[in-house]
């Protein structure tokens, strides 16, 4: 419902947005795999500090003391995509909080849970307490790509990532931007980096030449001024009274 009012006793129809739910579930399941991958790469000190999932993207905040390296990010991506390719079954079950802890299920730090909780198990890879929507198999996530990693607070990092259709749209946009940049640089996408490096060299050479010309022009200007000063001083010298009297002597 986007506008209007509901009154008591009115009949309504509820309908799930299947496409939205499907894409959201892919991103949600990806956060579970991501958290386990982060703990494997960075250490067991990593804990979830917040998250956001939508049909377009996912965001995962976690505890860590420094920025991740390119190698660490690449390793995390590799692990997540390996688990997607492994087509792990995703199973949910309700159990007691004590039983879930015995199973080794990860819980959100500071979260209060009731006596009955929902456990989401992804093969032998991930086991977490969660009440959200998920895929039935990790293969449904399709693919995973980290697009940014940044710090948001002391000891808290943030990863933003894409999966499935969101990642496809991202690469389509990159491809279009690359084609446009290549056209401006008068080259092809596969040679754009080489072309940019060549242009940077040309710009550097032009800047150096421009600096030389500016210095030469400054020297020439100073030389011209000095010539004019000498000429003026000569005129002043000749036109002085003593010089005129000397010039009339036999």
Roles of regions detected by a PLM:
Residues 236-237, 241-250:
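Single conserved hydrophobic/aromatic residue that forms the stacking wall/gate
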Residues 1-14:
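Conserved nucleotide-binding/hydrolysis modules and their immediate coupling elements
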Residues 45, 55, 62-152:
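Non-catalytic interaction/regulatory segments
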Residues 14-20, 57-66, 161, 233-235, ...:
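Short, hydrophobic beta-strand segments
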Residues 45, 55, 138-239:
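Terminal appendage regions of diverse proteins
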Residues 37-50:
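Active-site palm subdomain of RNA-directed nucleic acid polymerases
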């Amino acid at each position: 419902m986007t506008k209007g009012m509901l009154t008591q006793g009115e009949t309504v129809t509820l309908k799930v947005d299947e496409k939205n739910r499907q894409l959201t579930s892919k991103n949600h399941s990806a956060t579970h795999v991501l958290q386990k991958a982060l703990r494997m790469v960075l250490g067991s000190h990593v804990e979830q500090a917040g998250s956001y999932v939508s049909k377009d993207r996912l965001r995962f905040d976690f505890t860590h003391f420094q920025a991740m390296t390119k190698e660490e990010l690449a390793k995390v991506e590799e692990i997540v995509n390996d688990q997607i390719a492994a087509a792990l079954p995703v199973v949910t079950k309700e159990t007691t909080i004590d039983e879930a802890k015995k199973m080794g299920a990860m819980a959100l730090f500071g979260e209060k849970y009731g006596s009955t909780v929902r456990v989401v198990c992804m093969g032998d890879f991930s086991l977490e307490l969660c009440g959200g929507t998920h895929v039935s198999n990790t293969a449904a996530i399709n693919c995973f790509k980290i697009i940014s990693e940044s710090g948001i607070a002391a000891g808290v990092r943030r990863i933003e990532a894409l999966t499935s259709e969101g990642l496809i749209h991202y690469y389509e946009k990159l491809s279009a931007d690359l084609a446009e940049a290549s056209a401006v640089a008068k080259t092809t996408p596969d040679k754009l980096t080489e072309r940019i490096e060549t242009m940077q060299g040309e710009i550097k050479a032009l800047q150096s030449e421009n600096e030389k010309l500016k210095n030469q022009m400054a020297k020439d200007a100073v030389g011209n001024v000095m010539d004019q000063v000498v000429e003026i001083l000569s005129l002043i010298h000749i036109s002085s009274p003593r010089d005129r009297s000397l010039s009339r002597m036999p």
